[in-house]
Amino acid sequence: MTEKEMAKEVGFKYYNYVSTVKNNVLEKKGHLAGPFYYLNFKKISSNRIRRLIIFTMFEKSYSYDFIVRLIKNIESWSFFYPLQESTFNEMMIGIYSTDHQAIIRIFEYLKEEGVLHYYSVYELEDNLLTYNPVFYKMSGKQKEDTHYIDQEIDMEMNFGGCVFDDKDQETMKLSHLDRRLLMYLQSGFLKGELSKIMKHNAKLVDEDGEHPYVWGYNSWRYSYEKLTKNNIISKFYVIYPLPKDICSYFFLILAGTDEETTRKLAAGVGSNCRILRSGGMVRSLNPEDKGKTCWCAHFRSHPLFMHKISSLLEVPEVRTKLIYYCKSISSHGNDSYPVSYMNYYTEQSISLENKYYDRERMEIRYDYDLYYNNIKTLIEKDHLL
């Protein structure tokens, strides 16, 4: 939506007011973030790359800090979200994978060594698609405000789950600049403003004291236009239903009686109210239900909806519902009352540096054997203490 279209929608006479409200009100008050970009993984690497979503439980004798430092040895990590613990500490972890079995081998080792009590692994089909809150709906010609709590699940829709056209999936050879820009755009770094990204890169120094990332603005602009034209990136914003520091956060893994029902549930849960959802279809890699299709989503909502979600899903169509409540982030950035686990709400873009990307083969490769050995060394040292 352009700023002119947004101005017309909200009733502003002058469209330049939109950017003022966006920058000075919505972003500062925690209602708006971005832009971010979806990446077309099939076009940036000729080998298969998917994101794994891994739920973990670990003994309270191991801190969140220790687990995060440990798993960050898997250099293709994507995110860490601490969850509300019960008998065990719990965390949701995302990892970009080119070899699922190699990653499962690492987590199985951690379980055998007693670091993890339990883990479950799901393969994400595509991107986690973001669906922003619905603040009003039409009733005839009248606009009606929506609510923060869904009263029922709309089963009339079907979850599409794909940003990019499956027919256009030819892998593209990416330059060094292309790959750096992709990482910045995916993470929303500097709001994707090319002039700021250019200046930031020009200041970076490598191990030899050189400045290897100096490119002119026209080069950055050309790369951005190439990535856009070739359907490699797609821009989106994140809109929070409440200021983000007072939203409740939780993950939901959901399955219906069959795949079609699961897709209808995925499309319907939270679709007609003020709820922010980022979700995608996943495939279980767990022995007890290997291959089962589910929907996995990260919700940001009013606290009352988080407490109601379980009862909302008490319907005949639901066969599996797993709800993982994230730890509160309401005191994030509050120096007077620091929260020890706050630094472990963290995300990073896919790693496309030279050491991971083979430009001739157009492949992304991660050294999982190295990561396994590094983690094994850390565990052995920990056991000696």
Describe every region a protein language model picked out.
Residues M1-L385:
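A compositional/biophysical signature of low hydrophobicity enriched in polar/charged and small residues
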